[in-house]
Amino acid sequence: VKSILLFFITTALFISCNNTQQGNGTQKLGGDIKIDGSSTVYPITEAIAEEFRAVQPNVKVTVGVSGTGGGFKKFSRGETDVTNASRAIKESEAADCKANNVTFLELSVAYDGLAVVVNPQNDWTTSITVAELKKIWEPEAQGVIKKWNQIRPEWPDAEIHLFGPGVASGTFDYFTEAIVGESGKSRGDFTASEDDNVLVQGIEGDKYGLGFFGVAYFEENKDKLKLVGVDNGSGAILPTLETVRNGTYKPLARPLFIYVNGASEARPEVKEFVKFYLEVVPQLAQEVGYVPLPEEEYVRQTEKFNTFISAIPAAH
């Protein structure tokens, strides 16, 4: 009887242990992973989260959008496990994290180009210089630069209607720093939204509209919008896989990031998600319209991740 009982106990333990493995040998995990932040990085992270759900169906991964700045506010309070960012964390945001004992790891995940776009009926703007963009968007332009022919005399004597990301957006921060010369400095009389789809719809419906957002959103809506080449002194350049990666599309090419909460990283489901993220992002980033980092850079990011997690005690 004892031997039979021992057999059943051993068999039960074997089945129990075996059931913690997926068919592909991956350990089954549970729990929730909360992600928020940049609308620009959202398509990459959501695509990866969808793939991860297929591998780990018992892990609930939610990806919200509150802009890079809004995402860092939540992240610094420990409300999210991962935050998407279309710019590097600011000193003030890092200080907020420190004040709340939130440690973090910064990981570069892809490159992005900012697209300058107009309505398809706009037959006069095929390119624009960096100086002209500054003339349009700098704070001094508010109430002064109102018409297209104030940018170039041959352009129409018609009001220019501007669309752009809101002030909590990392895209807004990056654009203003690259074009105006100081992050966050801009005229205020433009249609602003953290939702890039609102900007797309606004420009699509306005012959005299002009705006900017991540190039992936242009790619999704290229049948509704017209892309404008940006001239930094070397001729008009369009944002493409090649020009963003090789740096010729400057100053509007930038790196994209995720930030991982150190305490969250101790949880096996978060650790596995970030590991999975770094494995699949080279392919998925390109599939959703972004530019992958060079292969050696992904190796470096993975090494950063491995070093970071090796110093964190495992969660129990």
Q: Model-derived features: where do they sit?
A:
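Flexible loop/hinge segments at secondary-structure junctions
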Residues: 17-316
